[in-house]
Amino acid sequence: MVVLVTSKHEDKHNIMAAGFHTTIGYAPLIYGVSLRKEAFSYDLIMNSGNFGINFVPVNYAELIQIVGTRTGREMDKFSEYNIEYDHGINLNVPILKEAYFAYEFKVIDSRNYGSHEFVAREVMTIYKDEDKFIEIDGWTMPDMNKLEVPLYLGRSVYATFNASSEQKDYV
């Protein structure tokens, strides 16, 4: 699953796609994302120490592809592609209005692993469209009857994960 990384430093902001990301720990909630040092977003994130991660529905797959293949050094992607956002509550990073789930992060560590820098960060704020989630056995899970999630297959190809996708419970 590809997420949209949003960043802001001083009067500059940017949005980019990231396919390498994961939860690292829960107490406190730590999340990591791999970024190329050459990316404009990397500069903004390292200078501000903050950024956002946004999960968007499948109707944004084309936007994910576009913002992931164009640099913010040459254009304001928010203006160019009419991307609506609010300023984050705690860290003032862009949080997409159409995100069904989003985080605001404070950078706590960064390490180089070849072509990418793995940036670990502490979650400062969580945004969730409550209507798009359900509780199952004490776990909050996406309600796939209300969501269609884009899954990146590679080479600009996306699939849709939704309620009609095969799902199995192996418990």
Regions found by a protein language model. Give the residues of each.
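Basic, polyanion-binding surface patches
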Residues: 1-171
